[in-house]
Structures are given as structure tokens and as C-alpha cells.
Amino acid sequence: KQGRRPMLVACDIYRPAAIDQLQVVGKQAGAPVFTLPGAKPPEIARKALAHAKDYGNDIVILDTAGRLQIDEVLMQELVDIKEAVPVDETLLVVDAMAGQDAVNVAKTFNETVGVDGIILTKTDGDTRGGAALSVLAVTGKPIKFQGVGEKLDDLEVFHPSRMASRILGMGDVLSLIERAQDAADEKAAEETAKRMLENKFDMNDM
């Protein structure tokens, strides 16, 4: 959408099918995926950066191994990656359904590696916003994006005011309106929004 040329880099060498899954995402997004079988993540990152410069990719996204519990080896691996290549931004992806484990990982991740922002996934679940508040409290870093589903289009810019509404049990009507606008013309979206606010939204509107 912004005319950039991103490249994804497969630095998760541990989880089975991680590279295959990243390649599927890359294909859907129209972005190349850099892989280097047999290499360690810091070396993969270095080679990927050189490759990106040669092929004109102006954004390089390093996909590293996920961690649901605190793992010193994997944490050190992230430190090694940041020492191997210049990193402009470090984003921690947090599962909103993971509870206290997510909070513990976020705290250790920020203390060990340093976090610039958070991506909160599975915010379409029933947890409302407890994870958002907890992660924000322990890291002091902003939540930049939220995942509301499994598709690429389900990654949205995070709006604190809308999460506050969810926590208070008011729902997130504005996000529903935005998604309706993407799928329909403006007049139809306005009518749909009006029906939502009047509690007249039915299966025909859906």
C-alpha cells in the first residue's frame, strides 16, 4: 500500500514447517522470503541484509523463533542477531490469549533484547484487553498493531480508545464500521453503521 519493497527473512530454524508457513505468507503478501538452510540466525540475518541491498528491498523483516516461556538460549540468539545487523525496530508479537506467560515473556524480552513496540494477536477472542494492559504495564512500550483474525488483512493499527471500549464491555463498533467501509461503498457503510448503533443490524446487513 505504501509502495515499499519488503522482504521476509526466515530466522526460525527450530519449529517444524516455520519456513514453509512464512513462504505461504510471503506469497500472499507478494513479498520474497529469504532462507539459508543450515545457517544460524545471526548469519541468516547478515546474508539477508546483503541480499536485500543487492535486490532493492527497502524493508527487511526478520521472523525469529516464538517463545511462550522464557528461554535463555533463544533470548541470547536475539541479542546475537542485534549485534550482527543494524536493527531499526524490534517488535514483540504477543498472544492475547496466553495470559501470564505472555506478560512474563514480554518483561524478560524487553529487559534482555529491548522492545520498540508490541503486536497483539488474537484480540478477536474473549480476553477483551487484559493482556494489552498487562504487557503495556511491564514494558512501557506502545502496542502498534493488533491481529483480529488469521488473514493478512486482519492486521490492524492498534487504537487504545477502542480497546478501552472493549474492556468496558462496549464493543468495538468503529473497527466494524471501518471493515464495512472496505467491503462496501461509503453510503452503504454509513447506513450499516447507523443500523449497528440502533441495534438493528441483521443477517441481511451481514
Locate the predicted segments by residue.
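Short, composition-biased local secondary-structure segments
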Residues: 1, 19, 101-105
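Post-Walker A helix-loop "phosphate-sensing" segment adjacent to the P-loop in P-loop NTPases
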Residues: 1-7, 140
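Switch II (G3) loop of P-loop NTPases
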Residues: 6-18, 28-85
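Structural and coupling elements of P-loop NTPases
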Residues: 21-24
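Conserved phosphate-handling catalytic cores of large alpha/beta enzymes
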Residues: 46-48, 57, 69, 75-83, ...
